Every structure is written in C-alpha cells, then in structure tokens.
Amino acid sequence: LIPMYLPLLSALIPAIVLLVYIYWQDRQSPEPVWQLIKATLLGVLSIPLSLCISSPLQAIGIVPEEMFTFGDAIRVAFLGAALPEELAKLFILWLVLRKNRFFDERMDGIVYAVCVSLGFAGLENVLYVIGDADWMGVALSRAIFAVPGHFCYGVLMGYFYSLAHFCPSKRSYYMAMAIIAPIILHGIYDAILFIVRVTISEWLSVILMLIFTLFCFYLWKTASKAIKKHLPSRDAMV
C-alpha cells in the first residue's frame, strides 16, 4: 500500500516549487509571506467559483457534457475551462489587491496573480492525482505541463493587471487584456489536448502533441519576458 501522503506531496510540490520561484524572482522587493499565503489560499476558492460559472453554461447546452467532435473539444476548452477558471482567478485577484497597501510595484501584480493561480492549480492537481491508479504518471505529466501552464496564465494576468493599476489612462484596455490573454492561452492549451482525445487519426495526434510541446515552450518564454519587464530595475522598459 502506498502512503496517502506520497500522492498528496507529488500533487502539491510543483505548485510549491513555482511559488518559491516567483518569490525568488521578486527578491529585490519581496511581498510579506503572509500576504502571499493568503493569496494562495484564496486562490483555492477559485475552483468552486469557476464551477459556479461553468455549470450553468453546461446546463443550458453552451458547453457539451461530452466531447465527440473538434467543435465540442474547442467549446469545452474555451467556454468550459479557460473562461470560467480565469474569470474566477481574476475575481479572487481583485479581492486580494483592491485594498492591498503592499501593491506598490508592477512586479507585485504578477506575484499575487501567480499565487492565486497556483492555489487553483494545487487543489486541481490534488483532485487529479489522488485516487488515480497511475498517480505517479499523472503527477509527473501535470508537474511538467499543467501546473506550469497555470503559472504562466497567472503571470500574464498579473502583468496586465499591474499595467491597469499603474497606467490609469489605459486602465480599461489593460484590464480587458488581464482576462483575454489568459483565456486565449489557456483555451489553446486545453483545445489541443481535447482535440487529441477525440481524433481517431494517429498522425494528427502526433502532430498536435508536437504543436502542444512547442506551445508550452512559447508559454514559458512569454511568461519569462513578462516577469523581466516588471522587475523593479526594469520598470522603465515597459
């Protein structure tokens, strides 16, 4: 028998590692640890909140309950996953930052958004890994792809959220981008995987998985650039 704490640890460690990573990136002017813990724990609440958005969409038929076609896969990816999940995260981020006196630098928006996003990803990972017969395989694949994906969506959300906060003249545009950019990237990520599930073509599956791998590299590169632009010493470059 495998001790329960092993699957649990394997599910949580990727999120913890990325939380430490973003904290280290902000080491020149770090946020209070208790604030980051609060943001991460509140991020966990974005899972039930996202279900409050996705369930009605499924109930009225906008999001199919099962996927049979490419169209179904795309609708589930964008409307059943990316839209409700990123909306829920943005709402939690707004709660965290609306009266936060520590939100005084552009990098802070990224740090808090990543904490919220990894709170979501941590619980989601636990739900996927715990109880799965192949928990080691699931934990490994999600540690490489899914959790870093949520990290990247959080970086972009925080990047634009900070611009909206510190550039009042373009607030509406940047706030719109704070939700549009994560939804598009999250939707593309899920759509590729969901299309692989429904296709019967082995060649298409291979091509899509190659595209998926390249897209994951693109995601990480984009997130890394966003972090560099918002680091305190680089503010003038944005």
Predicted features along the sequence, with ranges:
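Hydrophobic alpha-helical segments at protein termini of multi-pass membrane proteins
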Residues: 1-238
